[in-house]
Amino acid sequence: PASDRASLCDEAIRLARLLLRMYPSEPEIMGLLALMLLQHSRIAARFDAQGNAVLLEDQDRGQWKRPLIQEGLALIDKALRSRRPGPYQIQAAIAGLHARAARADDTDWAEIDGLYQALERHAPSPVVTLNRSVALAKLSGPEAALDLIAPLAPRLDGYFYFHGVRGSFLKQLGRNAEAREAFNRAIALANTPAEAAHIRQHLDSLSA
């Protein structure tokens, strides 16, 4: 339930604040707390009244909690001034760019793509590259994004999000049969009913 998620986030933020008080000049702890605050700021907009997941670009930004955003942005700006970047700082900087955009169309995807490339250098993983593909699709189109994630298939075949993202790119290209297959695979791997329902919406929107 949403209340349980909020309680867990509140507790995680409380612990991160304690950690920062113990190590007040550690930029990665600042980055961790900033990331938590920025993510928690969107919690009210992440699900609709039926409990279905709402994509970041479709969320009502008026529901985002501005005090948490302002605190998170101030923390990440302070952390980055140390010039000792790390994975948490980079992830928080990405979240910060989303938070700074008044509308989804205002998102600085070029900067986000660059930050994901930095994250790939600091903490390389197929999931980081998959996340970067979303930014690349906005910049260079879904074909380029598909090319980026194609080598990830063997390692991410059991990952719900991989097939959902891949299906979205295929759908944008009009490759509906392949998109349908990817979405069905994502539904089979979904961890929650909300995840499955979200993918089913994409599946239902495909033309026969």
Please give the residue ranges for each predicted region.
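Start-of-helix register in tetratricopeptide repeats
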Residues: 28, 87, 91, 127-128, ...
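Solenoid-like repeat scaffolds
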Residues: 21-22, 81-82, 117-122, 151-157, ...
